[in-house]
């Protein structure tokens, strides 16, 4: 469940496998769904076992499959690389030493789709004695639009000799937000888990729901936030980027230091001018597969000084810093893979902000003392939407404030339930966030 310490448990299990269970690092494989997750696991493992963590294979599904195919990833091939790798394993076209594993660890197993499941099954078939440790939460499967299906995690749990363990202790949230989340889960059917989550904290916490008649709820949400602001971290969660941008403008109008967790609207991180400059600088001067320390520092200095006025340079600096932390030796192929699999939001630093604004999708995996959710009644109330709301609800550590014009929360026990029948307007000043898609290149033709 959320806040149960899944990441901590997995990291300690990895350390135990290596140090206590005599599993050699080359026999251990961990697969994740994002470069950010792979990096976090590597960082945490380094804190536990030191430099030995550098030799543990922690990869995304895509990067592992590109390794099996013997080439560096690109955007076109990434669409079918997992299914291709699974097919090659089944047909015996992959070198045995590349797939010979005794332990396979899968993070966020609820996000597996048909291709990832086929890969896991292929590895299991080729390694009959291989242990599979899959950790996930079917209630947090919010990527169905990408083909994920928690049913595949359930299939693994049904394998002969498998053990199913429910992690129901929540160390993140106070009692009232956890009880509220448990009640909300009754909206979701066909769940794998059956045991309610239990808060391990003594604090009661607070849950407040405000039901509106108005279509627009931006102004009262901000007023509510101003009224309840505390010293801790606060986050406003929305359904769409458009809602997030409107709330950002309104918060700044009230003088609140706020930051948004955002993407570049389809622009890949490796296509940013600052990142391309850094890669190109190294590519033109590198003599061997290994990036020398001198060349690395030279590339940093030149890139950072060239783009010192760029607001996007902070993403590149964060990327370079994380790669340095998790790679003892810097191979250019590894760095290109690291960059290719990363996204802008992976390096979005929201520290120092009084309020963070984000869509629910981008806030997954994060936590905040206070959470304010904007829930519009404009969407079909299916299981996918309910799981998305559940992810938002479980980001709150202490207090949860829900602003809605729908009826999803009417039946739940809360500390305060308010009805607001006033009509609110769309904010007079809104911010239109432009991206590269809004540039008309034809305008510059003579």
Stretch-by-stretch model annotation:
Residues 2-7, 12, 35, 103, ...:
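Conserved helicase motor core of SF1/SF2 NTP-dependent helicases
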Residues 35, 175, 237-400, 406:
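Core RecA-like ATPase module of SF1/SF2 helicases and allied nucleic-acid translocases
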Residues 1-74, 182, 394:
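P-loop NTPase Walker
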Residues 213-231:
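Conserved interdomain hinge at the start of the Helicase C-terminal
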Residues 30, 58, 131-137, 401-402:
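Structural recognition of the conserved hydrophobic beta-strand(s) that form the central parallel beta-sheet
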Residues 57-103, 112-127, 336-360:
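Conserved helicase/translocase P-loop NTPase motor core
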Residues 388-391, 398-446:
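Helicase C-terminal subdomain and adjacent C-terminal extension
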Residues 52-58, 193, 256-263:
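Conserved RecA-like helicase motor-core motifs
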């Amino acid at each position: 469940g959320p806040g149960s310490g899944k990441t901590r448990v997995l990291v300690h299990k990895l350390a135990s496998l290596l140090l206590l269970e005599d599993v050699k690092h080359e026999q251990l494989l961990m697969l994740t769904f994002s470069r950010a997750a792979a990096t976090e696991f590597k960082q945490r493992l380094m804190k536990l076992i030191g430099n030995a963590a550098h030799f543990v294979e922690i990869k995304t599904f895509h990067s592992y499959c590109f390794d099996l195919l013997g080439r560096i990833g690109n955007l076109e091939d990434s669409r079918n690389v997992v299914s291709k790798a699974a097919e090659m394993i089944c047909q015996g076209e992959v070198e045995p030493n590349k797939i010979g594993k005794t332990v396979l660890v899968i993070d966020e197993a609820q996000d597996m789709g048909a291709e990832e499941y086929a890969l896991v099954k292929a590895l299991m078939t080729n390694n009959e004695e291989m242990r599979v440790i899959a950790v996930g939460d079917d209630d947090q499967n919010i990527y169905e639009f990408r083909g994920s299906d928690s049913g595949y995690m359930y299939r693994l749990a049904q394998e002969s000799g498998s053990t199913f363990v429910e992690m129901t202790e929540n160390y993140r949230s106070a009692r009232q937000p956890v009880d509220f989340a448990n009640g909300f889960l009754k909206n979701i059917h066909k769940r794998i888990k059956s045991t309610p989550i239990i808060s391990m904290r003594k604090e009661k916490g607070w849950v407040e729901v405000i039901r509106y008649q108005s279509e627009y709820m931006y102004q009262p949400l901000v007023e509510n936030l101003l009224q309840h602001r505390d010293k801790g971290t606060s986050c406003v969660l929305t359904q769409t980027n458009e809602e997030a941008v409107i709330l950002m403008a309104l918060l700044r109008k009230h003088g609140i230091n706020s930051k948004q967790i955002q993407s570049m609207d389809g622009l890949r991180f490796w296509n940013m001018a600052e990142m391309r400059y850094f890669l190109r600088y190294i590519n033109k001067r590198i003599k061997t597969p290994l990036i020398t320390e001198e060349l690395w520092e030279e590339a940093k200095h030149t890139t950072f000084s060239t783009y010192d006025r760029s607001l996007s340079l902070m993403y590149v600096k964060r990327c370079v810093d994380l790669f340095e932390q998790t790679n003892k030796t810097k191979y250019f192929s590894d760095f290109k893979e690291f960059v290719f699999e990363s996204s802008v939001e992976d390096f979005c630093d929201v520290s120092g902000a009084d309020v963070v604004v984000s869509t629910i999708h981008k806030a997954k995996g994060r936590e905040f003392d206070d959470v304010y959710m904007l829930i519009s009644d404009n969407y079909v109330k299916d299981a996918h939407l309910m799981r998305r709301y559940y992810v938002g609800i479980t980001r709150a550590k202490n207090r949860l404030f829900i602003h809605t014009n729908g009826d999803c929360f009417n039946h739940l026990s809360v500390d305060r339930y308010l009805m607001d029948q006033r009509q609110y307007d769309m904010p007079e000043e809104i911010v239109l966030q432009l991206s590269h898609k809004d540039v008309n290149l034809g305008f510059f033709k003579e």
